Amino acid sequence: DCHEPMIAHIKKGLVKRIETSGLRGELANAISNGLMDLPVIFRSHGDRAHAIATSRMKIDVAFIGAPSCDCAGNTNGINRDGDTSYDCGSLGYAMVDAHYADKTIVLTNNIVAYPNTPCAIPEIDVDYIVKIERIGDPKGIVSGATKFSMNPRELKIADMAAGVMENSGYFKDGFSFQTGTG
C-alpha cells in the first residue's frame, strides 16, 4: 500500500488537505475513521484538469517523473534512443500540472539531446531538471484497476470505444490520448 506513509504525514500536520480521484487501503480506512479535519475532495481526471486550469485548485510544485527530458526541459513519456524500459506513454495528466504549477521539477534518469521533440511538456513549463538513478518501474502502472481484462463484456466495450475514436475524424498521425480506470 504505497499511500500508507501519508497517514504519518497527516498526523504530523504536513498534509492538511487531499484532492484525489480515489482512495483505498489503510489511508482510506484512516480517513473514513476521522483522520482529517477537512473532507477529501474527489475529482475525475477531467475535472481535476479543469479545476487546475480555472484556478479552483492550485499546484505549488509539480514533481513529474519522465523517461526522457533534454537539458532545456522538453519532456516525454517515451524515450527515442531505443531504451523503452522506462516508457510510460502519454504525459497528458502531467501536462496540465506542469503548465499551471508555480514551479515544475522533472525527475528523469535519461537526459537526451536537445531538442527532445515533439514533446509532451515543453521547456517553457519546466523550471528544474533533476537526474536520478531510476524513475520507477512502468510495470507498476498495470496493477489493481488497470490490469488487462479478459472479461468479454469489457473487451466488447473497449472494442466499440476504439471504433468510435478511429471513426471520429480526429484519428490520424500524431493522435494521442490517455486512458484511466474510469
Per-region residue spans from a language model:
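Conserved alpha/beta enzyme-core scaffold
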Residues: 1-181
